[in-house]
Curated annotation (Swiss-Prot):
Homodimer. This is LexA repressor. The record marks 113-114 as: Cleavage. The gene is lexA. It holds the Pfam family Peptidase_S24. Disulfide bonds: none annotated.
C-alpha cells in the first residue's frame, strides 16, 4: 500500500519518462510534489525501492527502473518503463532501428551540453529514429551532444538527442536555446519574471541567466539515442 506522496512521485516519474525519454531530476521531483527539500524525495525513492516498485541502478546518473506499478495505475493503462544511463546491453525486447517503424531525421550538427557553442545547422547528414520517438505533429530534427552539463538528466557526451521544433517551452522542459542569435545550448528552461534561466544538470556548471529577449527556444527534447 503506497502513501499519497509515494503514489504521486511514482506517477510523476512515469509521466516524465514517457514525455521526455529521461527521468526527472530530484529538483523537479521536489517541485512537483511541493516539498521543501530533496531529502524528502530521497525518502520517498527509498520507500518505493523497498516496496519493490522501482530499482535504482548503481553507478549510473539518475537511472531508475520502474519494476511494477500499483494495480490502480495498471488498470489505467500504465506499463513499467526503464531508463538506464549507460548500460552495456540494449534493453530486453529492443529491436534494431532498421527493423522497426523508423524515419530519417536531419542531423543538424552539434549542440553544447556545457557552455554555449555556435549553432551548426547544415543538415547534411541524417539519423534513423523509431517513429514512436516523435511526439505528435510538428517538425523534428536530431543533434549530437557535446559536453557533460546534462549528465544528471541522463544525457551524455556523444548522445543523439531528438528535438521537436517549437518556439515555446514550459518551466522544466529541456530545450535547445539560441542565445544572442548565434550560440546554441541544451539546457533546462526556467522563466523568472523577465529573465530566462538555462539550468544544467551537473553541479560542476552554473545556471546561465539572460534577459528574455536574448534567448530563443528552438525546440524541446523528445527523445535520445545512445550507441552501446
Amino acid at each position: 500500500m503506497l502513501t499519497r506522496k509515494q503514489m504521486e512521485l511514482l506517477d510523476f516519474i512515469k509521466t516524465r519518462m514517457d514525455r521526455d525519454g529521461v527521468p526527472p531530476s530530484f529538483d523537479e521531483m521536489k517541485d512537483a510534489l511541493d516539498l521543501r527539500s530533496k531529502s524528502g524525495i530521497h525518502r520517498l525513492i527509498t520507500a518505493l525501492e523497498e516496496r519493490g516498485f522501482i530499482r535504482r541502478l548503481a553507478h549510473r546518473a539518475r537511472a531508475i527502473e520502474i519494476v511494477k506499478l500499483p494495480e490502480a495505475m495498471e488498470r489505467a493503462g500504465f506499463a513499467p518503463r526503464v531508463i538506464e544511463g549507460d548500460r552495456t546491453e540494449p534493453p530486453r525486447g529492443a529491436r534494431p532501428v532498421e527493423t522497426a517503424n523508423a524515419l530519417d531525421l536531419p542531423l543538424m550538427g552539434r549542440i553544447a551540453a556545457g557552455l554555449p557553442i555556435e549553432a551548426i545547422t547544415d543538415g547534411a547528414q541524417s539519423v534513423t529514429v523509431p517513429s514512436m520517438m516523435l511526439s505528435g505533429r510538428g517538425q523534428h530534427y536530431a543533434l549530437e551532444v557535446r559536453g557533460d552539463s546534462m549528465i544528471e538528466a541522463g544525457i551524455n557526451d556523444g548522445d543523439i538527442v531528438v528535438i521537436r521544433e517549437q518556439q515555446t517551452a514550459d518551466n522544466g522542459d529541456i530545450v535547445v536555446a539560441l542565445v544572442a542569435d548565434h550560440e546554441a545550448t541544451l539546457k533546462r528552461f526556467r522563466r523568472r519574471g523577465g529573465m530566462i534561466a538555462l539550468e544544467p544538470a551537473n553541479a560542476s556548471y552554473e545556471t546561465q541567466v539572460y534577459p528574455d529577449h536574448m534567448v530563443k527556444v528552438q525546440g524541446r527534447l523528445v527523445g535520445l539515442i545512445r550507441s552501446y
